[in-house]
């Protein structure tokens, strides 16, 4: 019996690989809700965790201009997705997985090798 891929509510393709991670939104029991961000993986050193940096514009009322800001978010990296440093990924909000992890990687939009 082949393991089914769950519908997570986003219009993206599920990963081709299978995994047995219970914290995987595709093959496990993890539900996603809330915000969805796109960013670049800047670190993948902790096991099953990536640090994603996203850039956004913030309006400064005094100067009537926008400034570019960035934030770093820790996200769970399931084995079936396996994002690496330099990859452009899509992350979605979920329940707290640890003290600092509240997001999970749901897709790799562009691999680091393809971006060069």
UniProtKB/Swiss-Prot annotation:
Record's keyword annotation contains Cell inner membrane: no
Keywords, in A-Z order: Ribonucleoprotein, Ribosomal protein, RNA-binding, rRNA-binding
GO BP terms in the entry: translation
Classification via SUPFAM superfamilies: Nucleic acid-binding proteins
Alphabetized Gene3D superfamilies for the sequence: 2.40.50.1000
GO molecular function ontology, one term from the record: structural constituent of ribosome
Pfam families, per the entry: Ribosomal_S17
GO CC term (a single one): cytosolic small ribosomal subunit
InterPro entries noted in UniProt: NA-bd_OB-fold, Ribosomal_uS17, Ribosomal_uS17_arc/euk, Ribosomal_uS17_archaeal, Ribosomal_uS17_CS
Role this protein plays: One of the primary rRNA binding proteins, it binds specifically to the 5'-end of 16S ribosomal RNA.
Subunit-structure text: Part of the 30S ribosomal subunit.
Family per record: Belongs to the universal ribosomal protein uS17 family.
Protein name: Small ribosomal subunit protein uS17
Organism annotation: Pyrococcus horikoshii (strain ATCC 700860 / DSM 12428 / JCM 9974 / NBRC 100139 / OT-3)
